[in-house]
From Swiss-Prot:
GO molecular function: protein folding chaperone
InterPro entries according to UniProt: Complex1_LYR_dom (IPR008011), Complex1_LYR_LYRM7 (IPR045298), MZM1/LYRM7 (IPR050435)
Signal peptide: none
Subcellular location(s) of the protein: Mitochondrion matrix
Protein name: Mitochondrial zinc maintenance protein 1, mitochondrial
Species whose genome carries this gene: Emericella nidulans (strain FGSC A4 / ATCC 38163 / CBS 112.46 / NRRL 194 / M139) (Aspergillus nidulans)
Quaternary assembly: Interacts with RIP1.
Length: 115
């Protein structure tokens, strides 16, 4: 019975690592820090306990947030007047303020983020 949560924990850990790769692509410093944080949290809760299912669920939620809600911006460090460029990938959740009022439904975006 104890082997089933271990498989789920491993699956959750892999999902977190995949999500960090997507969210922090081309930002090695942040990518390594996020992966180190994930590893430390999983190591801290290595033994199966009463709260293991909650910890696994938390890891899956973190992976979802990283994958769907984190957008990184970058600009030329030498030019203070340079515009920020956002790296919006295919899995980013898009919508406008009116879409917040539509609970539980997918929002179809029919326009690009930058006009």
């Amino acid at each position: 019975m104890a082997s089933q949560p271990a498989v789920s924990a491993l699956s959750a850990y892999r999902q977190v690592l995949r999500a960090t790769r997507i969210a922090f692509q081309n930002d090695t410093r942040v990518l390594l820090a996020a992966r180190q944080e994930a590893r430390q949290n999983f190591e801290k809760h290595r033994r199966y306990g009463v709260d293991t299912p909650m910890q696994i669920n938390h890891a899956l939620e973190v992976a979802s947030i990283l994958r769907h809600n984190i957008v990184q911006g970058a600009r030329d460090a030498e030019d203070e007047n340079a515009k920020w460029e956002l790296r919006i990938h295919d899995e980013i959740e898009r919508g406008d303020n009116d879409s917040i009022k539509v609970a539980g439904k997918k929002v179809k975006v029919d326009k690009p983020c930058s006009s």
